[in-house]
């Protein structure tokens, strides 16, 4: 995953990861934190 291949491949996989996966992880961590505090 180096060079021009990574440069052309990365944006297509990075956008859905940031838009969908990161919020899901953050919401999951917040849920676990809130449940742990309760």
Swiss-Prot record:
<dbReference type="Pfam" id="PF00796">
    <property type="entry name" value="PSI_8"/>
</dbReference>
<keyword id="KW-0602">Photosynthesis</keyword>
<dbReference type="InterPro" id="IPR036357">
    <property type="entry name" value="PSI_PsaI_sf"/>
</dbReference>
<feature type="transmembrane region" description="Helical">
    <location>
        <begin position="12"/>
        <end position="32"/>
    </location>
</feature>
<keyword id="KW-0472">Membrane</keyword>
<dbReference type="GO" id="GO:0031676">
    <property type="term" value="C:plasma membrane-derived thylakoid membrane"/>
</dbReference>
<keyword id="KW-0812">Transmembrane</keyword>
<protein>
    <recommendedName>
        <fullName>Photosystem I reaction center subunit VIII</fullName>
    </recommendedName>
</protein>
<dbReference type="GO" id="GO:0009522">
    <property type="term" value="C:photosystem I"/>
</dbReference>
<keyword id="KW-0603">Photosystem I</keyword>
<comment type="similarity">
    <text>Belongs to the PsaI family.</text>
</comment>
<keyword id="KW-1133">Transmembrane helix</keyword>
<comment type="function">
    <text>May help in the organization of the PsaL subunit.</text>
</comment>
<keyword id="KW-0793">Thylakoid</keyword>
<dbReference type="GO" id="GO:0015979">
    <property type="term" value="P:photosynthesis"/>
</dbReference>
<dbReference type="InterPro" id="IPR001302">
    <property type="entry name" value="PSI_PsaI"/>
</dbReference>
């Amino acid at each position: 995953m180096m060079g021009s291949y990574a440069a052309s491949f990365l944006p297509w996989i990075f956008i859905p990861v940031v838009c969908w996966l990161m919020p899901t992880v953050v919401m999951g961590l917040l849920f676990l934190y809130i449940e742990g505090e309760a």
